[in-house]
Amino acid sequence: MADTGLRRVVPSDLYPLVLGFLRDNQLSEVASKFAKATGATQQDANASSLLDIYSFWLKSTKAPKVKLQSNGPVAKKAKKETSSSDSSEDSSEEEDKAQVPTQKAAAPAKRASLPQHAGKAAAKASESSSSEESSEEEEEEDKKKKPVQQKAVKPQAKAVRPPPKKAESSESESDSSSEDEAPQTQKPKAAATAAKAPTKAQTKAPAKPGPPAKAQPKAANGKAGSSSSSSSSSSSDDSEEEKKAAAPLKKTAPKKQVVAKAPVKVTAAPTQKSSSSEDSSSEEEEEQKKPMKKKAGPYSSVPPPSVSLSKKSVGAQSPKKAAAQTQPADSSADSSEESDSSSEEEKKTPAKTVVSKTPAKPAPVKKKAESSSDSSDSDSSEDEAPAKPVSATKSPLSKPAVTPKPPAAKAVATPKQPAGSGQKPQSRKADSSSSEEESSSSEEEATKKSVTTPKARVTAKAAPSLPAKQAPRAGGDSSSDSESSSSEEEKKTPPKPPAKKKAAGAAVPKPTPVKKAAAESSSSSSSSEDSSEEEKKKPKSKATPKPQAGKANGVPASQNGKAGKESEEEEEDTEQNKKAAGTKPGSGKKRKHNETADEAATPQSKKVKLQTPNTFPKRKKGEKRASSPFRRVREEEIEVDSRVADNSFDAKRGAAGDWGERANQVLKFTKGKSFRHEKTKKKRGSYRGGSISVQVNSVKFDSE
């Protein structure tokens, strides 16, 4: 699609395409929410679909995109992860477009954002309806970015340079590498990635736009820069993730935006957004995985609501996201290579690090999970909202200092993930979404930790770097990238556990989640499987928050030590075993209730069933079988006409003195072959019967 054509496009032009795409893919719930949020109507049946547009775009835009993308995007194209390359192209186009429109004016910005939509729409088709929705959010974000600061364009130019680094880093960990690049490009880039997250938050929460705009300016420079550079390379993944996350967020955003606006307060979200550049990448990674799952379930578009949702999921999902956020920040601080390896590490380390991170918030998540998910989400969002504002204030302060920025970015990143997590918590209601929710809750925890202890973050970074190094040990899968980012963040959080405890207030309930987080992190290699197992664990952990609290207290300190991690993992294993006993699908409590109900009901029903069959059917059947073989026709039940009752020769009229009487006397005793033999002998011999009578001895039945 030519730039001129894209500039003419308006975001609303894509709504029908997205709506049609969602409906075509049987995402009726998402489609209905999207239609309500955007007021879009079904497109003409003859109009081209998003898939068609995307396929055309792939064919027509590759060469021009290479030129536009230049450094970072080209490298990514070389990588050519199908979805990531597409998303990178989309992000690069969006970045290029964003730069031009930002310079031109707000109106051009809208156009640029729309073109991005078009590019995103193509990406959406490949990514799925969630990616489409996210692309729309990205368009909105682009618009916001442009009006917020045209300055961002300069950062973009700077950011463009870092993409090569990302290209150098493994593609599978492009998200983590993008996080690394943020630190490498020097915290402005981190701010840029954070800026992307803020833009998402802004689009998600309309109420926040004012403060986010403030936060964005800081992040905006970073936004444009990192969004253009890191987003061109990492944002290829990020854009995909953002698209997916954004799509769900957009759909749920209208409803949850209100909730998020009230509890989170704009200031906290903006600051977190700005600092959450790294987190945004990790979140996006998770979101990429989750959006598909989330589509089926409810979405929380607003980061604050996501926090509340994340609290619910904190027990299960928070461990992953928290770990991802803390570890990504650490890995980003350490180096892009470490971040790449960190994604791998995250698979291994998440289990260890997650335990310490989740302890503070996980318990609340369990509690919330116990309470209705919606009410608990709102409560958790409110609770976390105060914590986030604090972190927001701290993160801006920390930004001036170069070292503080990485922590701030981490803390901020956690907020973004919470936003993603917000959506995930809802999906969490769905089992598949449980892992996503866990990551979101962990992100929220990471934000609190960062708020309470900026210094601790620095220390955490040092510690996480070691885990990041370990990460290379575990080969990173593309799926493990999100987990790896979360595990990296979690690595950062381990030093923070004291801060988390402080933020936790009642640490005991939160520690319970720590075990969950540990179990989840340990199972990070298979996040979805782990999430289901973790969910099982959560119900049990909820039942016994105190022991877990004790464990959580021990865990944070021990997490730094391998022994502590191992012990935590063992605890997680025990929890998993216990939970394994429970049913896999559904929330732990629900499962328990269902199981108990089933057990209570089934025994009675079984007893009843046993009694009935044993008594009536079995006795009757047994008696009948024992007494006689099966008879379709029972003699005693049928009345036979007397005329037909006896068919013997003697019973017939005129039998006495009949011509065949003598023969009958001889033959009536023989049956089978011998009867024919005997009859033949009688015919050949000198047999002489009586006189042959012409009387009719047959029986005549009157038609009745």
Swiss-Prot record:
Glycyl lysine isopeptide (Lys-Gly) (interchain with G-Cter in SUMO2), cross-linked positions: 67, 76, 189, 200, 352, 357, 399, 405, 410, 416, 424, 449, 461, 510, 584, 609, 618, 652, 668, 700
Post-translational modifications: Undergoes rapid and massive phosphorylation/dephosphorylation cycles on CK2 and PKC sites. NOLC1 is one of the mostly phosphorylated proteins in the cell.
Residues recorded as bearing Phosphoserine in the entry: S87, S88, S91, S92, S372, S373, S376, S465, S567, S587, S627, S648, S691, S703
Biased amino acid composition, Acidic residues: 87-96, 170-182, 434-444
Cellular compartments per GO CC: box C/D methylation guide snoRNP complex; box H/ACA snoRNP complex; Cajal body; cytoplasm; nucleolus; nucleoplasm
Ranges occupied by Acidic serine cluster repeats: 84-95, 127-138, 170-181, 231-242, 274-285, 335-346, 373-384, 434-445, 479-490, 524-535, 559-570
Composition skew (Low complexity), residue ranges: 120-132, 149-160, 183-207, 215-236, 246-279, 408-419, 474-485, 504-529
Subcellular location(s) per record: Cytoplasm; Nucleus, Nucleolus
Single GO MF descriptor: nuclear localization sequence binding
Keyword annotations from UniProtKB, A to Z: Acetylation, ATP-binding, Cytoplasm, GTP-binding, Isopeptide bond, Methylation, Nucleotide-binding, Nucleus, Phosphoprotein, Repeat, Ubl conjugation
PANTHER family given in the database record: NUCLEOLAR AND COILED-BODY PHOSPHOPROTEIN 1
Family: Belongs to the NOLC1 family.
Protein name: Nucleolar and coiled-body phosphoprotein 1
Organism: Rattus norvegicus
Gene name as annotated: Nolc1
